[in-house]
């Protein structure tokens, strides 16, 4: 893809799943990658796969809920890999103690709301605030946020998670609208059912069958499916695409 080779990107949430797949895809295209995650063991494993394949990457432990750790993520990237050209926000609290308790508005405790907002939404705000000034200084850059098909209102559960993802869609458009004329692109992807994201999805056979029927496809999503689209949106091949929120999950959300 055009404009990835020799560039530097931060994957904020690259220990597993879509984030790990994106980090590996970017490195495979010749980019240098910082794999940031609260799960530093997973981040280091991603980096090991990248470097073993001949790529360039570092692992940095950080927390989307901790502004100082995000600044450290940015500083470490610049010190080790050079100027930042793009950011992929993919982290979220998918733990059983948080997402597992996120049900309906009547039954979801406020501590789940606070935690979900702090990580899934404000975490993206924090990373954007930390990286955007560097992109503006260079006169160009790309941000790709991870949303969810649940932001479209089709999931009757996970009220807090889906609300934050709807807000991520608006944050994406806000950045594109305000800084597009200064060379900044910001887009988002809404993954369909991607295996490897949560253990719940791995085990729920009924959910998988429902998705296959709705998506009119022969298989479930893989991290590499999303990674290809995210890498494209970060690349110069997508320089005419800004402020868009793309659903990537078969044909279950066809639009005219």
Language model regions located:
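Short, small/polar-rich loop/turn modules that mediate ligand/substrate recognition or access, typified
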Residues: 82, 180, 185, 241-243
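Alpha-helical segment proximal to the catalytic Tyr-Lys
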Residues: 133, 177-178, 239
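Residue(s) in the substrate-gating loop at a strand-loop-helix junction
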Residues: 148
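Catalytic Tyr-X3-Lys loop
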Residues: 85, 106-125, 144, 161, ...
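Canonical Rossmann dinucleotide-binding motif of NAD(H)/NADP(H)-dependent dehydrogenases/reductases
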Residues: 2-34
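Short C-terminal tail/terminal secondary-structure segment
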Residues: 153, 213, 231, 242-256
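Active-site helix of classical SDR
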Residues: 128, 164, 172
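Substrate-binding pocket helix/loop in short-chain dehydrogenase/reductase
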Residues: 97-117, 199, 211
